[in-house]
C-alpha cells in the first residue's frame, strides 16, 4: 500500500473513533461510525484474495445494518424527546434498538456470527485493529447511554456472549478465530458490569486491549496463524514463546496475573449488588475459555514437537523485526495485579 494512502486511512480510523467518543450530537456520532467502517475496509483487503474480499463484504454488511438500526433508534428518540443530544435514551424502544445496534457493532451474542469469520479472513494487522481499536467507539456510546439500557437485555446478551466465546473456541486450530471467540467472551464480561458500574467496563477494556495487543504482536513477530505453526516458534524465538505462556494464562484470568483483575472485580461488584446466580454462572463459563487457553499453552510451550536439525537452526536466519512496545506490553499484561488496591476509586 502506498505510504501516503496508508497515512490517510489510519488517520481516518483514528479520527472516526475520536469523533464518536467526543461528539454530543447523534448525527456526528453516526458520521464517526461510518468513517471508521469505510476506512478499515482497505486495510482488510490489503492482500487481495477471496477470503479477504469475503470478510470485507461481511464486515461492511453487518456494520451498515448496525448503523441503520442506530439511526432508527436516534430518530425514534428524536420524535419522543425532540433533541439530538447524545445522552440516555428516553424511549424504551429506542434504547432497545440502540443496544442491539451497538451489540452488533461489538460482536455481542446473538450478533456475533460475523466476528470469527471476518477475523479469520483478514491479515493479522487488520485482525488486531478489528478486535481492539474498533471496539472503542461502540463501547463509548454504550457507556454514555448505560443508565437507560434495559438490564435484562444486556445481561442476556452478556451471558450468551461468555458462553459462545467459551464454547466456540474449544475446537479451533486457527489462532485468529481463537482470538475472535476470546474477544466475544471479553465483550460479554464488559457488558455484564455496564449496568452496575460503567467505570469498571473501562478497566476491563483497558486490560483486554493490552493482552490482545500483546498476543497479536507475538503472532505477527513469529508469522503464525495456526496452533501447528505456533508449536514450532520455540525454534525461532524461545524467550517470546516462554512469555507467551504467561500472556495466555493472563487472558484466561488466572491469578496472580493481570487478567485476573477484571474478573475478580466484576464478580465482586455484582455480588455487592445482590446478584449471586449470574456471577456464579459467569465464573463457571469462564472455565471454557481457560480450557482452550490452557490447550494452546500446552501445545505451544509445554511440549516439543519432533523437528529436523535444520528447523532447530531456524532462529539464526530470522530477520529482526521491530519489537519496541512488546516488553512494556508483556509487563502490563502480566504484572498489574499488585496495583489492585489502588483501584478503590472505582467503588
Curated annotation (Swiss-Prot):
Signal peptide: none annotated. The chain crosses the membrane at residues 1-21, 59-79, 93-115, 149-169, 178-198, 201-221, 239-259, 274-294, 325-345. It catalyses: a ubiquinone + NADH + 5 H(+)(in) = a ubiquinol + NAD(+) + 4 H(+)(out). GO terms for biological process: mitochondrial electron transport, NADH to ubiquinone; mitochondrial respiratory chain complex I assembly. GO terms for cellular component: mitochondrial inner membrane. It is a multi-pass membrane protein. It comes from the Eukaryota. Its main location: mitochondrion. One of its GO terms (molecular function) is NADH dehydrogenase (ubiquinone) activity. It is found in: Mitochondrion inner membrane. InterPro entries: Complex_I_Subunit_2, NADH_DH_su2_C, NADH_UbQ_OxRdtase_chain2, ND/Mrp_TM. It is an enzyme of class 7 (translocase). Keywords: Electron transport, Membrane, Mitochondrion, Mitochondrion inner membrane, NAD, Respiratory chain, Translocase, Transmembrane, Transmembrane helix, Transport, Ubiquinone. Its EC number is 7.1.1.2. Core subunit of respiratory chain NADH dehydrogenase (Complex I) which is composed of 45 different subunits. Interacts with TMEM242. Core subunit of the mitochondrial membrane respiratory chain NADH dehydrogenase (Complex I) which catalyzes electron transfer from NADH through the respiratory chain, using ubiquinone as an electron acceptor. Essential for the catalytic activity and assembly of complex I. Belongs to the complex I subunit 2 family. This is NADH-ubiquinone oxidoreductase chain 2. It comes from Hippopotamus amphibius (Hippopotamus).
Amino acid at each position: 500500500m502506498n505510504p501516503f494512502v496508508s497515512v490517510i486511512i489510519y488517520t481516518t480510523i483514528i479520527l472516526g473513533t475520536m469523533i464518536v467518543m467526543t461528539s454530543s450530537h447523534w448525527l456526528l456520532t453516526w458520521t464517526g461510525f461510518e468513517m471508521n467502517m469505510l476506512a478499515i475496509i482497505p486495510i482488510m483487503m490489503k492482500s487481495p484474495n477471496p477470503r479477504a474480499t469475503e470478510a470485507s463484504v461481511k464486515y461492511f454488511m453487518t456494520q451498515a445494518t448496525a448503523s441503520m438500526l442506530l439511526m432508527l433508534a436516534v430518530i425514534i428518540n428524536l420524535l419522543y424527546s425532540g433533541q439530538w443530544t447524545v445522552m440516555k435514551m428516553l424511549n424504551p424502544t429506542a434504547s432497545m434498538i440502540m443496544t442491539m445496534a451497538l451489540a452488533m457493532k461489538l460482536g455481542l451474542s446473538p450478533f456475533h456470527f460475523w466476528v470469527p469469520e471476518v477475523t479469520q479472513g483478514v491479515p493479522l494487522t487488520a485482525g488486531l485493529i478489528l478486535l481492539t481499536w474498533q471496539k472503542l467507539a461502540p463501547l463509548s456510546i454504550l457507556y454514555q447511554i448505560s443508565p437507560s439500557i434495559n438490564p435484562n437485555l444486556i445481561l442476556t446478551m452478556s451471558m450468551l456472549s461468555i458462553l459462545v466465546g467459551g464454547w466456540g473456541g474449544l475446537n479451533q486450530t486457527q489462532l485468529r478465530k481463537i482470538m475472535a471467540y476470546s474477544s466475544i467472551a471479553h465483550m460479554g464480561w464488559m457488558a455484564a458490569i455496564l449496568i452496575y458500574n460503567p467505570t469498571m467496563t473501562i478497566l476491563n477494556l483497558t486490560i483486554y486491549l493490552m493482552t490482545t495487543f500483546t498476543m497479536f504482536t507475538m503472532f505477527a513477530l513469529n508469522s503464525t496463524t495456526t496452533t501447528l505453526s505456533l508449536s514450532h516458534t520455540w525454534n525461532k524465538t524461545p524467550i517470546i514463546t516462554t512469555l507467551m505462556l504467561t500472556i495466555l494464562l493472563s487472558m484466561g484470568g488466572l491469578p496472580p496475573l493481570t487478567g485476573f483483575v477484571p474478573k475478580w472485580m466484576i464478580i465482586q461488584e455484582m455480588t455487592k449488588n445482590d446478584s449471586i446466580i449470574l456471577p456464579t454462572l459467569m465464573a463457571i463459563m469462564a472455565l471454557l475459555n481457560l480450557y482452550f487457553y490452557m490447550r494452546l499453552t500446552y501445545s505451544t510451550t509445554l511440549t516439543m514437537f519432533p523437528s529436523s536439525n535444520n528447523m532447530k537452526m531456524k532462529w539464526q536466519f530470522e530477520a529482526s523485526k521491530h519489537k519496541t512496545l512488546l516488553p512494556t506490553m508483556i509487563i502490563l499484561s502480566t504484572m498489574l495485579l499488585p496495583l489492585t488496591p489502588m483501584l478503590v476509586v472505582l467503588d
